[in-house]
Structure formats: C-alpha cells, structure tokens
Amino acid sequence: LFLRAKDKDLSADCVRAYNDWHIDEWCGAYPDRFIPMAIVPLWDPKLAANEIRRAAEKGCHAVTFSENPEKLGLPGLHLDHWDPFFAACEEVNTVVCMHIGSSSSMTVTSLDAPVDVSIAITPMNSFLALNDLIWTPILQKFPKIRIALSEGGIGWIPYALERMDYT
C-alpha cells in the first residue's frame, strides 16, 4: 500500500502511525496474547532501519518483510542494498518475518488451474525464499539474524535440505 504511494514523506508518517496504533493500542490491549509485528518503509532501507529501532524501543521485535522484494520492483536480496535493514534487525534482536505471497506473487501452474492447486503449492514460496536467502551474503554478514518463514508449513524442508546439500 505505502510502497506505491507518490508522497513518500506521507507514506513514512502513515507507517509510523500504523505501528504506533498496532503496537500501543491493538497489541498493547492484550500484551500477553498478541505479539506486535511492525511494518517498515521498504522503499528506503535506512528509514526502515530507523523504524525497526523505534518499534523495538516500544517492545516490538518482529517486522514484516517480503519473501521476494524484487517482485515488488525493489532490489533483490543478493545486493547490499538491504544491509541497513538487516543490521538494524540484528542489532535490536528483531525477527524478520517473511510472509508467503507478500511479494504479490504466488506460484501457479497454469492460468486455468483451480484455486486448490495454488493452495496446495503455496509452500513453494517458502522454499524459494529460503533458497534465495541461503545463497545471499545476508546470513554470513548478520550471523545473529533471525528469520521466520510464515505460513509455509514444514513438509518442504527435507527436500530443501537435500537440494542444498547437493547443489
């Protein structure tokens, strides 16, 4: 939503306002039940890093991030473009939560396939995201980074490990 907006200053203000509401009001109402997860201005990794630190000061240690930022028109994970973002997450012990489909792109077999096919192969987004991460310098540069691949299940993990071992 905010990534595509023309007024980036207003968008950044909206991100901060959303995080304040989400952390303080929504999750703050039931702190033993809800875990807040911040959003960040993905169009600027330095602004994103600042928002991660600001959210951490409020007690929020999880942040959403696209499983494939390149599909959103942003630089890919293999570039140092994202270093300020990942450095901030490591610095304040914030988990990077990569949600499947957050790149606005899901794996499809064919345009005429029923929705059931897409639902069944959704974990492939997690498989693709993990493989992309493994071959980036991110995990070496930021060895204490914590990453969560959300809603992809675990059935694909043995296959992913086997592929990584023999690639």
Where are these regions (language model features)?
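Active-site-proximal gating segment of KS-fold condensing enzymes and close homologs
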Residues: 9-25
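Catalytic pocket of metal/acid-base enzymes, prominently hydrolases
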Residues: 1, 23-28
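A short small-residue
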Residues: 1-3, 114-115
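Catalytic pocket-lining loop regions of alpha/beta-barrel enzymes
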Residues: 27, 32-35, 40-167
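Surface-exposed, active-site-proximal loop segments in enzymatic domains
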Residues: 2-11, 46
